[in-house]
Amino acid sequence: MWLLLLLPLWGGCAEPGDSEWVNLPSKCEVCKYVALELKSSFDETSRTRELIDTRYGFLEDDKKAKKIKYTNSDIRLIEVTEGLCSRLLEYNLHKERSGSNRFAKGMSETFQTLHHLVHKGVKVVMDIPYELWNETSAEVADMKKQCDVMMETYEDVIEDWYRHHQEADLTEFLCARHVLRGQDQSCLEEHWDSRKGDTGPSTGTKKQKKQGEKKNKSKKENSGPEEERRQMEQPTAAKEEL
């Protein structure tokens, strides 16, 4: 069975001024995902007890030098911020979504369907060749470009948050108070709705909870009938002693 489809779905082939094809991310949307990836990256690097030795070779006898926690070190801040914008290239454009939610990790529902048709032997004809279906869209490429500028411009703000204000929400601190101060902040109120194929940043909380539940469940299952009988006999034994 053959199906002929002519679908203009990819922003990569559009002219920069063609609003019907390309809807570049706003400053609000860029900051939202910069903050989201910063949170995720800081969370990923918070699960270590590694100590950093502040002494250098020619200062080995310096008794004042001491080890500091990696989680409080400049090294952690540099490692997180250095490759931050590259993480945005993991996002794809989901044109079936609206607002800032059109940016999400994972393949869009539309392209999942098209790939499924191709694998079933259906011929799908679009305005771009099949080999370019998974290329970075113009919108995502622009988001990465804006991120590079934003990270450089607000480097001091991010460092200030890291050193003195980690109790404050990073999206609120970076975007609402600084980057978007006096500007449109409506996208910050748009909540990310996970759908099939999406792989949003994970904090590990849910995973740890499930592992704990599984451990308790396994403990109950392994107790067996013998353990239940022993527990039932305990009150009787105590009564006989009295």
Curated annotation (Swiss-Prot):
The protein, known as: Protein canopy homolog 3
Subcellular location: Endoplasmic reticulum
Function text: Toll-like receptor (TLR)-specific co-chaperone for HSP90B1. Required for proper TLR folding and hence controls TLR exit from the endoplasmic reticulum. Consequently, required for immune responses.
Lineage, uppermost ranks: Eukaryota, Metazoa, Chordata, Craniata, Vertebrata
GO cellular component: endoplasmic reticulum
InterPro entries according to UniProt: DUF3456
Main location, first listed in the record: endoplasmic reticulum
Signal peptide segment: 1-19
Disulfide bonds: C28-C187, C31-C175, C85-C147
Segments of this protein annotated with the region Disordered: 191-242
Composition bias type Basic and acidic residues, residue spans: 210-242
Alphabetized UniProt keyword annotations: Chaperone, Disulfide bond, Endoplasmic reticulum, Immunity, Innate immunity, Signal
Example GO BP: innate immune response
Protein family: Belongs to the canopy family.
Domain of life: Eukaryota
Family annotation (Pfam families): DUF3456
Domain Saposin B-type: 26-235
